[in-house]
Amino acid sequence: MLEIGFCTLEDQCPYLKDKRSRIEYKYIENCPKEINNELIKRGWRRFGRYFSRPICKDCDECLSLRILVNEYHFSRSERRVINKNINTKVILRMPNLSNEHLFLYDKYHRFMEEKKDWKRYDLSFKQYCNLYVDGFMNFGYELAFYIEDKLVCVDLIDILEDGISSIYCFYDPDFSYFSLGKFSLLNEIQIAKKMNLDYIYLGYFVKKCQSLSYKADYTPSEILKGTKELFENEILWEK
C-alpha cells in the first residue's frame, strides 16, 4: 500500500460563501477495505484513490453524519417513494463508465447549476474515472437505476465492514416524479439491512447549506465528534 499525504491552500468554501476552506488529502494506492473503513469512521471521504477531509481554520460546520441502520424504519412517504419505483430496475455492480454515465452526469449538473447555482465542471472520461471508478478494489460499487431501459440514476457507494459509505449520486431531473435521489438512499438502507451492516455513512451535514442540510431528515443518526488519526482508537459518535 502506497500512501501520500498533502493539503490544499486555503480557498473559497464550496458550501458556505462567507467561509474559507482547506482540505487534507491522502492518496492511497491499493487501499485495503479495513483502512478505508477506519478512515471513513474518522470523517474522511473517498473519491477514487484520494481520501479527503476538511481542516478549515475557525470553522467546524462540516459534520460527518451516519444513519443508524438497525434502528431505521421507513416512513409513509418513504414507502410511497419505494412503491412509485416498483418497476424501476436496480443493478448493483462494479463502478462503470460509459457515454450514458457522462451524459447523465452532465445533465444532472446543468440542472443543479440552474436550480441551486452549483458550479459546473465538464468531466472527461479520464476525470470521471479518476473520481468515481479508480480505487474501487473489493468495496466500491455503483447502484444503477433504469426506467424502461434508460439509465436514470447512478449511486456510487463503498460497502465496508460496518456499513455503506455513500459517495455520490446523480440522476435525470426529467424523472423527478420518481424521487430518484431519495430512492437511491432508501436502497442503500435496504441493502445494509440485508447485509446486517450497522451504518450508512452519508458524508458531511452542513446545516446552512441547502444541498447538504437534508441529511438531518434521516433519523436516527449520529454525528462524529472531533477528528481522529488512524492510530487513535477513541472515536466518538453521538446522536
From Swiss-Prot:
Annotated compartments = Cytoplasm
Keyword Transcription (UniProt): no
**Any single Gene Ontology cellular-component annotation:** cytoplasm
Provide the protein name: Aspartate/glutamate leucyltransferase
Q: Which family does it belong to?
A: Belongs to the R-transferase family. Bpt subfamily.
Q: What GO biological process terms are annotated to this protein in UniProt?
A: ubiquitin-dependent protein catabolic process via the N-end rule pathway
Q: Which HAMAP family match?
A: Bpt (MF_00689)
Q: Highest taxon of the source?
A: Bacteria
Q: Which UniProt keywords apply?
A: Acyltransferase, Cytoplasm, Transferase
TM stretches of this protein: none
Alphabetical list of InterPro entries matching this protein? Acyl_CoA_acyltransferase, Asp_Glu_LeuTrfase, N-end_Aminoacyl_Trfase, N-end_Aminoacyl_Trfase_C, N-end_Aminoacyl_Trfase_N
Task: Report the catalytic activity.
Answer: N-terminal L-glutamyl-[protein] + L-leucyl-tRNA(Leu) = N-terminal L-leucyl-L-glutamyl-[protein] + tRNA(Leu) + H(+); N-terminal L-aspartyl-[protein] + L-leucyl-tRNA(Leu) = N-terminal L-leucyl-L-aspartyl-[protein] + tRNA(Leu) + H(+)
Assigned EC number: 2.3.2.29
Q: Which organism is it from?
A: Campylobacter jejuni subsp. doylei (strain ATCC BAA-1458 / RM4099 / 269.97)
Keyword Amino-acid biosynthesis annotated? no
Single annotated GO MF:
arginyl-tRNA--protein transferase activity
Q: What does this protein do?
A: Functions in the N-end rule pathway of protein degradation where it conjugates Leu from its aminoacyl-tRNA to the N-termini of proteins containing an N-terminal aspartate or glutamate.
